Amino acid sequence: MRVLLQRVGQASVEVDRQVVGEIGRGLLLLVGVEPEDSAADIDWLVRKIVNLRVFSDAEGRMNRSVLEDGGEVLAVSQFTLFASCRKGNRPSWSRAAPPELARCRFDQFVAAMSEALQRPVPTGVFGADMQVALVNDGPVTLWLDSRQPE
């Protein structure tokens, strides 16, 4: 499972020109699922994300987590995080989980994140054509891969 994490001043996601999820200050998570992902991958990512110290303390150092800062989280499914661009000019999506499995794992991820934060996590609409708007804060952008924990 992969997550592209961005610290934001605000973010929203629209489907058919209707806002379906939005947050103020917090984290925008673009989430990709591969077939081998399990509950262990979800648990590792959720623990890592809620405890990452990416928000500034009183001295301006990145020393506070989204939990400590009271920030919000918006999660958007994105199978393109598993694109392969090795051959030719058209990306291949063969490493991404099939839609049914990806939806299940994404929903499990969102439920686990909501439980860890003790509040709902807004999302986009799985499989829909979405427009994501965000105001990067920093910018702070991190790449997390449960198969390559660094």
Swiss-Prot record:
Annotated GO CC locations: cytoplasm
Quaternary structure and partners: Homodimer.
Name of this chain's protein: D-aminoacyl-tRNA deacylase
Function noted in UniProt: An aminoacyl-tRNA editing enzyme that deacylates mischarged D-aminoacyl-tRNAs. Also deacylates mischarged glycyl-tRNA(Ala), protecting cells against glycine mischarging by AlaRS. Acts via tRNA-based rather than protein-based catalysis; rejects L-amino acids rather than detecting D-amino acids in the active site. By recycling D-aminoacyl-tRNA to D-amino acids and free tRNA molecules, this enzyme counteracts the toxicity associated with the formation of D-aminoacyl-tRNA entities in vivo and helps enforce protein L-homochirality.
Annotated source species: Laribacter hongkongensis (strain HLHK9)
Domain of life: Bacteria
Pfam families: Tyr_Deacylase
HAMAP family: Deacylase_Dtd
Family statement: Belongs to the DTD family.
Cited InterPro entries: Daa-tRNA_deacyls_DTD, DTD-like_sf
Designated gene of the protein: dtd
